[in-house]
Amino acid sequence: MQPDGSLQVEDTVRGVLRDVLGLSAERVADFRADTPLFGALPELDSLAVAGVLTELEDRLGILIEDDEVDGEMLESFGALTRFAAGKALG
């Protein structure tokens, strides 16, 4: 993975979480790799997950298959960012 590309993906993931979940820019800016997401953010319920994944697909130009979606990828900000980077950057 290229560092520049990874940072772009991280910024995109932050933007998606901010926009889809209605989180403040300040709150999302404080997210670290170990910041818990699903089960810890009340805004990220099962319905919101679909919106987040769809928006990631649109913004990153990727396709997320149903069988790729699991609790681990949504466990933390770092896990979601790594998943998105893996799809976007190959």
Sequence positions of predicted segments:
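Phosphopantetheine-dependent thiolation modules in NRPS/PKS and related acyl-activating systems
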Residues: 1-44, 48-54, 58-59, 63-90
